[in-house]
């Protein structure tokens, strides 16, 4: 009994500590330069490292339909160097300084970041300012990166099982909005584009007023502000209005169904439901619902479809974080001998349960606990804090959401989950994709 009492006491103490960590405020300073660049500084001396990042408010949705893939191409192209930096030296310089770097592109934004020892902060600011205003964009760089992007497409999409999944969903779920193409775009358009088109895209979107610079970690705020002004203060505004897509996706009124054949061994079923943008309060409920269905061994899809019925080899569900109305996807890869129709029926049964019935108190508390755990995990390191600060400013214009968003999850009730599931997870609001082996295609 004493051992049990001790265990309970220890658990309570750990839970209390976790609760304090979850609610610990993340401090930051933010301001604008005269050229429109928004700057966010987060001071954290727990480790002698710093993360510098720039998020540009440009993604694949900003592209011309006849020039898809531009934003992703620029993710690569802007590592080519600059007027004051040798070609291909960007990565070498950061790695020589003991740092790491990367970049990624979504439908809504492009994100560059590097984490270095804190005594190398000034170096990263110089390099990001070079990327913003002095990038080397010429025929040599274009040809180099065309080859790189084509190879990436082969590896990640063409030669990967189910690699075309997102492309198929985007192309069929959307008819009007530019989410209808994926960030990788089409190699044909990148090949056809002229140097002048790339220069115009760069001068339009990779400008101070379309970016947020975030620096987090072991920094001296006063010194950092001086360096920010030194390297970014002299960069001029872009000089023209930044175009934003205005297309609105029509409301879907009937279920869509698509068969797609690829080099896979087992059929897969994808259910893609239209959902509101991440700014909408219902989006938080949708995140919790996808977590309920697929996150962990005790999730509903896992227990029912994989463990009990053995109809699926793998299952999953997630909602894309989109600035505009997007999709929440549920997928399953069928076990050998299981038809896609049977797998779809099993998935539908679990979806209908959350539409018609409130979840248990135990499940609900587990969802909230997981949201809190995810929040702590994302903000344990400077890189995670920096990414979140950039995201909250870019899409919400509310940087302090990093301290308040958790309350949005906590405010979702069991009734909200049932209501939101019933509203969005209807058959008329979805696309069903059967991702099938080529051997099943009728000749």
Model feature map: region roles:
Residues 199-202, 257-258, 316-319, 405-406, ...:
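Generic recognition of flexible, low-complexity loop/linker segments
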Residues 1-7:
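Bacterial N-terminal signal peptides that target proteins for export
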Residues 7-16:
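Bacterial N-terminal signal peptides
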Residues 42, 47-60, 69-73, 87-132, ...:
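M16 family metallopeptidases and their MPP-like homologs
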Residues 19-91, 113-116, 125-128, 199-304, ...:
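His/Glu-rich zincin catalytic helix
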Residues 150-156, 247-260, 369-378:
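Short, conserved secondary-structure transition motifs
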């Amino acid at each position: 009994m004493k051992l049990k009492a001790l265990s309970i006491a220890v658990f309570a103490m750990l839970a209390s500590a976790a609760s304090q960590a979850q609610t610990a405020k993340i401090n930051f300073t933010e301001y604008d330069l005269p050229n429109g660049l928004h700057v966010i500084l987060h001071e954290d001396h727990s480790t002698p490292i710093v993360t510098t990042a720039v998020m540009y408010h440009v993604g694949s949705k900003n592209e011309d339909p006849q020039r898809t893939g531009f934003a992703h191409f620029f993710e690569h192209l802007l590592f080519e160097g600059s007027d004051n930096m040798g070609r291909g030296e960007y990565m070498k310089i950061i790695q020589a300084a003991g740092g790491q770097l990367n970049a990624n592109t979504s439908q809504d934004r492009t994100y560059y970041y590097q984490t270095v020892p804190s005594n190398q902060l000034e170096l990263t600011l110089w390099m990001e300012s070079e990327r913003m205003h002095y990038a080397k964009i010429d025929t040599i760089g274009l040809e180099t990166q065309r080859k790189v992007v084509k190879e990436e497409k082969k590896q990640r999409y063409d030669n990967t099982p189910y690699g075309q999944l997102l492309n198929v969903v985007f192309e069929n779920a959307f008819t009007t909005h530019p989410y209808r193409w994926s960030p990788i775009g089409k190699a044909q358009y990148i090949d056809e584009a002229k140097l002048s088109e790339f220069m115009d895209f760069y001068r339009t979107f990779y400008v101070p007023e379309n970016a947020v610079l975030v620096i987090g970690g072991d920094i001296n705020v006063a010194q950092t502000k001086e360096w920010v002004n030194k390297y970014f203060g002299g960069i001029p505004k872009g000089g023209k209005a930044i175009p934003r897509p205005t297309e609105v996706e029509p409301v879907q009124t009937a279920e869509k169904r698509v068969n797609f054949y690829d080099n896979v061994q087992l059929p897969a079923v994808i259910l893609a439901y239209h959902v509101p943008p991440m700014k909408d309060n219902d989006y938080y409920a949708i995140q919790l619902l996808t977590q309920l269905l697929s996150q962990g061994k005790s999730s509903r899809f896992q227990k029912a479809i994989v463990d009990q019925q053995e109809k699926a080899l793998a299952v999953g569900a997630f909602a894309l974080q989109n600035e505009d109305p997007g999709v929440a996807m549920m997928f399953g890869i069928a076990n050998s001998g299981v038809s896609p129709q049977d797998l779809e029926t099993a998935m539908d049964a679990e979806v209908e349960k959350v539409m018609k019935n409130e979840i248990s108190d135990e499940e609900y508390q587990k969802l909230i606990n997981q949201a809190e755990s995810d929040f702590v995990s994302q903000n344990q390191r400077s890189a995670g804090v920096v990414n979140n600060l950039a995201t909250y400013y870019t899409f919400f214009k509310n940087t302090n959401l990093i301290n308040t968003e958790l309350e949005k999850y906590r405010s979702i009730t069991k009734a909200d989950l049932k209501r939101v599931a019933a509203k969005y997870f209807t058959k008329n609001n979805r696309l069903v994709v059967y991702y099938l082996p080529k051997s099943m295609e009728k000749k």
